[in-house]
Amino acid sequence: MSSIETTELTVDHQQNYDGVFPQVIACDTDGADLSHVQEWIAANKAKVLNDLSKHGAILFRGFPVLSDLDFDSFVQAFGLDGFTYQESLSNAVRKNRTEKVFTANEAPPAVSIFLHHEMAQTPLYPSKLFFYCEKAAEEGGATPICRSDILLKELEARAPQ
């Protein structure tokens, strides 16, 4: 097998701003493994990054990414610049799982984390984020995402200066 087949899906609460948000790409190839995913990324990197720019977020579904190490390999396959959590100078409590993969937050489940720009308070912040769900929450647990550019336009329309 030299590559994998993918399709675009729709999901609940998907929005449309001159393109769907988020875009959802599903792996349709039974028996695919991480090496097939890496080949697919190599062959489709330019399109995926262009789609990311257009749609604002991409949700990958059904890809064989089964551990933090697989996730690290998935992200590294894009060949993007990155940095370690320590380099970010953030003071949030997180644990490194690999050199460039760290937990999102170590707060107790009862603590709500509201919508925010990742590492906006630090001098070094990411231009792209990758999230991986290792274990889904038994209830709740959603990770809300927002098109900040669209939100700003909406706020300016509703509350002009």
Regions from the PLM with identified roles:
Residues 2-161:
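Non-heme Fe(II) oxygenase catalytic core, chiefly the N-lobe of the double-stranded beta-helix
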